[in-house]
Amino acid sequence: MLDNVLKIATRQSPLALWQAHYVKDALMATHPGLTVELVPMVTRGDVILDTPLAKVGGKGLFVKELEIALLEKRADIAVHSMKDVPVAFPDGLGLVTICEREDPRDAFVSNQYHSLDDLPAGSIVGTSSLRRQCQLAERRPDLIIRSLRGNVGTRLGKLDNGDYDAIILAVAGLKRLGLASRIRTALPPEVSLPAVGQGAIGIECRLDDARTHALLAPLNHPQTALRVTAERAMNTRLEGGCQVPIGSYAEIFNGEIWLRALVGAPDGSVMVRGERRGSPEQAEQMGISLAEELLENGARAILTAVYNGEAPA
């Protein structure tokens, strides 16, 4: 990095570019005189749109090319949606900053119906997230759930074209793109537990790049970082990936972290839930211990069955 230039690796989707510009603006406001440049790139996750992510390598497909750019020093930082960031990082790279979280809930989007409960039996709902699919199937087994890939605009276009009666998207993405008016209902965590890190923006960089770390430090949001730390610790212990429906959501009330999590069979037939409360200093340990509880209460059997291509008992 030149003394006054910082380069951001980002995907080219509208939402990814919004996030990159958000970080760029925050950096320039915090460090007058700093020049920030975007390095847009296409990832495999952006190209492979005809196959569920779970079958082609998971959400890590969205970050690999960005990480290569960091390692080759073509960029100084990479900006990610935290829900797309795998639990492990390549040697020499790490997550150094987590920005303040936007609304982490899932959004019910429909042109005809006001809520999930309003959908008639047999309605077609679009989502490619196994986490969303399993919770929908558990709550409304009478619905037809179909895969839906592509960026936010593409997904809304398919809804508007009549391919689906409703679709499920992230509230955060719709709000960031100025599309909050498309949200019919924001689904509470009790109905659709969010993905790990959903709504948060993470910044990855080289671990030995002290200057960049110092530039990024003011952008870190401690409460969001604690919440996401608890969620990711749980997911790391479960060795969770796109192939398994895993939800995890941490909130902070009165100085205490409340962490909820679930592991489910893709068809919603089996669901294991748990929760923990504790001090912020225990965020990582809470995530690990909650994962252990879920594993003992049936999640291990679900994970084993799904990874072996079997139906959970």
Swiss-Prot record:
The keyword Transferase applies. Pathway: Porphyrin-containing compound metabolism; protoporphyrin-IX biosynthesis; coproporphyrinogen-III from 5-aminolevulinate: step 2/4. Its EC number is 2.5.1.61. Pfam families: Porphobil_deam, Porphobil_deamC. It is an enzyme of class 2 (transferase). SUPFAM superfamilies: Periplasmic binding protein-like II, Porphobilinogen deaminase (hydroxymethylbilane synthase), C-terminal domain. GO terms for molecular function: hydroxymethylbilane synthase activity. The keyword Cell membrane does not apply. Its cofactor is dipyrromethane. It catalyses: 4 porphobilinogen + H2O = hydroxymethylbilane + 4 NH4(+). The modification S-(dipyrrolylmethanemethyl)cysteine is found at residue 242. One of its GO terms (biological process) is protoporphyrinogen IX biosynthetic process. The porphobilinogen subunits are added to the dipyrromethane group. PANTHER family: PORPHOBILINOGEN DEAMINASE (PTHR11557:SF0). Belongs to the HMBS family. This is Porphobilinogen deaminase. It comes from Salmonella arizonae (strain ATCC BAA-731 / CDC346-86 / RSK2980). The gene is hemC.
